[in-house]
Amino acid sequence: MQKPTRPQPKAGVLDIAAYVPGKEHVEGVAKVYKLSSNETPLGPSPHAREAYRHAGEKLELYPDGQALALRQAIAETQGLNISNILCGNGSDELLGLLCQTYLAPGDETIITEHGFAVYKIQTLAAGATPVTVKEKNERIDVDAILAGVTARTKIVFIANPANPTGTYLPFEEVRRLHAGLPQHVLLVLDAAYAEYVRRNDYEAGLELVSSNENVVMTRTFSKIHGLPGLRIGWIYAPLHIIDAMNRIRGPFNMNSAAIAAGAAAIRDRAHVEKSVAYNEKWLAWLTEEFTRLGLRVTPSVTNFLLIHFPDDAAHSADKADEWLSRRGYILRRVGGYGFPNALRMTVGPEEANRGVVAALTEFLK
């Protein structure tokens, strides 16, 4: 066997398809509306901006390795025990820590057909095998998940609400899923868009985590709180899981600005409610307008819509994306999520929302 001439990554790493974020620029277009990453058009709380500026006065100091101020703010506003909260550099880091902590080669995770790409990436990075199960009508199928569980299953990932569909699983179904899982299987509830949901049959998962040893819930500050640039996530989990994750977590995984701005953001309930009200108004308007144009829209409870395009080549999702991009509107292609003829659109500023509708009206003529 020939000796390698340079360092080699471990087996499987080069088989991982790298995550591709939503594009931000269009060549030759000066003014661009980025509607591809589900960012809030209202931005963060003014209090979060001020806390961020104040944190800049102490950059010579290491951050609090326990992120105590942020964990206290989360605990107080959510009514939780601070000991059950761990913060991370985005919920992506926390999902990765879960996989590093609980997966080994030969283990399996279950992800759903249109599930968030990071679940698969982190599973493979840990040397385990992701098993994909079908969804039903663009919604998570509990029976399909339970049928996919084997002796090798260690983690089940559920995005609720789901991305890129914007659909949600009623909480009785989440409870049914949990009841059907072996006690050693970890159920991960990724509730990144929970704050946007206003449905009586939806719960983010706090009670289920509180009363069980094999359920965790992850949340983010990148959506309703408008702080994706600071990368802030948190997990609510049983103490034994928090303890295990802390053993491999980096000692200063949260920076000072993120801790300060996050604490201020989650305490500003008025800004959150303002953001929810804005989203509800324009989500409904966009859904109605796209439907009027003859486009099918998957019913969404989030801050984005999945728009389905006709089968004819002249009006495909790819053609629509090119048309919109030339006019400065960047939506997200979702072929990699199993929707080759759909685009995902963030609810954006009013002028962008109206502009996309006007552009698609012209495109579909």
Curated annotation (Swiss-Prot):
Its EC number is 2.6.1.9. One of its GO terms (biological process) is L-histidine biosynthetic process. The keyword Transmembrane does not apply. It catalyses: L-histidinol phosphate + 2-oxoglutarate = 3-(imidazol-4-yl)-2-oxopropyl phosphate + L-glutamate. InterPro entries: Aminotransferase_I/II_large (IPR004839), HisP_aminotrans (IPR005861), HistidinolP_aminotransfase (IPR050106), PyrdxlP-dep_Trfase (IPR015424), PyrdxlP-dep_Trfase_major (IPR015421), PyrdxlP-dep_Trfase_small (IPR015422). Pathway: Amino-acid biosynthesis; L-histidine biosynthesis; L-histidine from 5-phospho-alpha-D-ribose 1-diphosphate: step 7/9. The modification N6-(pyridoxal phosphate)lysine is found at K223. Its cofactor is pyridoxal 5'-phosphate. GO terms for molecular function: histidinol-phosphate transaminase activity; pyridoxal phosphate binding. It comes from the Bacteria. Keywords: Amino-acid biosynthesis, Aminotransferase, Histidine biosynthesis, Pyridoxal phosphate, Transferase. The keyword Cell membrane does not apply. NCBIfam families: hisC. Homodimer. PANTHER family: HISTIDINOL-PHOSPHATE AMINOTRANSFERASE, HISTIDINOL-PHOSPHATE AMINOTRANSFERASE 2. Belongs to the class-II pyridoxal-phosphate-dependent aminotransferase family. Histidinol-phosphate aminotransferase subfamily. This is Histidinol-phosphate aminotransferase. It comes from Brucella abortus (strain 2308). The lineage of its organism: Bacteria, Pseudomonadati, Pseudomonadota, Alphaproteobacteria, Hyphomicrobiales. The gene is hisC.
